[in-house]
Amino acid sequence: MKLSALTLVRHRREHLVNLMLSLDAQHRRPDELVIAWMQPEPETNLPATRFPVRHVMVEGDALPLARARNAAVATARFEALVFLDVDCIASPTLVERYHHALRRRAGLYLGEVHYLPADAVRRRADGMLDRERLARLGEQHPARPAIEADEIRPEPDPGNLWGLSFALMREDHRRAGGMDEEYVGYGGEETDYAWRLAAAEVPFHWVGGALAWHQHHPLYAPPWPHFDAIIANARRFHRRWQHWCMDYWLEQFSEAGAIDWSPSADRIEVLRRPGEQEIAAARLPASARYG
């Protein structure tokens, strides 16, 4: 069974280079990498790889994440699909473990992600990534479970799909109807996708040994730069599923007096929008690994 790795890119060249290097160093390399570009032109001078790299351009000034994922799937040649965020660096067994899990049984498989501090990524003298350093510095998110390297564990909650690293078969993506492209900008489209997969009776599992390291980028708490998209996408999700997603961020906005909302409410009322100083003040220090 052949396997396509898929990633989405907007202005993350160095992170993409590191992802590509890590995929080329896999115990079992992907049979291709599909890059969905959410920018006017693809990056140039990318590293050579021992697998084909295919490109698809995705239009949209706002971050068209759902459209880009669907475009990547449509471009992929193979039935087994591994989605990796461009901020990820794959550990050497990631593709091998996802491939093993999908051969064993179709479903949605989630891999562990450990978060790196700023300036964690280093190259060795031979130009390869210093994986020992990444393993030493990577930190597990407190909301995520630890998985043994050879373990496959059922996951009953579809809400635990975070879009950084997961795998499934093309047929299950099709059964779920793909991603809803009415979600535009940051937030909500992955949770909606998870519930669509669950409604299609696709089983969810954690798979050990499919570890990725998340490369650091600027973080905000509350995530004011994505305020408008989060509100619009949360409303869309609630209309479809009659409950809220992104509750953690909505609570932050509510506590800051920007929205009138509660988990039991059936609507969000925007009271004010963040100002430039408020956005700047919410930027977390470089030591923060997640918001």
Where are these regions (language model features)?
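Short, flexible, basic/aromatic active-site loop/helix in glycosyltransferases
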Residues: 129-158
